[in-house]
């Protein structure tokens, strides 16, 4: 059974992923198509907050991820890896109540489920470095 927060993260990931192929459509509208009556009120609110936060901070998030890609550009990554990294980087930097380990573990699970056999390990390496150098100090105490 998926926890409400895990389902929420999956909804955000799916919206980000679909937006890659539906660029002319609004990201928030894509999310609304994914959120149905099986999501509780808090999960919907959290998903909407994540999407708004990712949209508002996307250039900074992408720039930060790009700094840790060795011999790769963000555009060369698979859509799965790119959007898992965006989701998790947002959560690491802006969602103060979520422990770093939880964010990274959840991102690895999504990457393994939807990506290639190497996606989990790849995402783990990038996020670990981002967390160590950029996560707010109080997150290390959670």
Curated annotation (Swiss-Prot):
Molecular function via GO: RNA binding
GO biological processes: DNA-templated transcription termination; transcription antitermination
Coiled-coil region list: none
Signal sequence bounds: none
Source superkingdom: Bacteria
One of the Pfam families matching this protein, by short name: NusB
A GO cellular component entry from the record: cytosol
Keyword tags: RNA-binding, Transcription, Transcription antitermination, Transcription regulation
Similarity-based family: Belongs to the NusB family.
Function: Involved in transcription antitermination. Required for transcription of ribosomal RNA (rRNA) genes. Binds specifically to the boxA antiterminator sequence of the ribosomal RNA (rrn) operons.
Listed name of the protein: Transcription antitermination protein NusB
């Amino acid at each position: 059974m998926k926890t409400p927060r895990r389902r929420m993260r999956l909804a955000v990931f799916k919206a980000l992923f679909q937006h890659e192929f539906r660029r002319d459509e609004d990201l928030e509208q894509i999310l609304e198509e994914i959120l149905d009556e099986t999501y509780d009120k808090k999960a919907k609110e959290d998903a909407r907050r994540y999407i708004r936060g990712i949209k508002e901070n996307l250039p900074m998030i992408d720039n930060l991820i790009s700094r840790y890609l060795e011999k790769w550009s963000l555009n060369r990554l698979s859509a799965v890896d790119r959007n898992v990294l965006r989701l998790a980087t947002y959560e690491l930097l802006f969602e103060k109540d979520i422990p770093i380990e939880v964010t990274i573990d959840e991102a690895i699970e999504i990457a393994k489920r939807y990506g290639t056999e190497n996606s989990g390990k790849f995402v783990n390496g990038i996020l670990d470095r981002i967390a160590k150098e950029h996560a707010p100090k109080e997150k290390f105490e959670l």
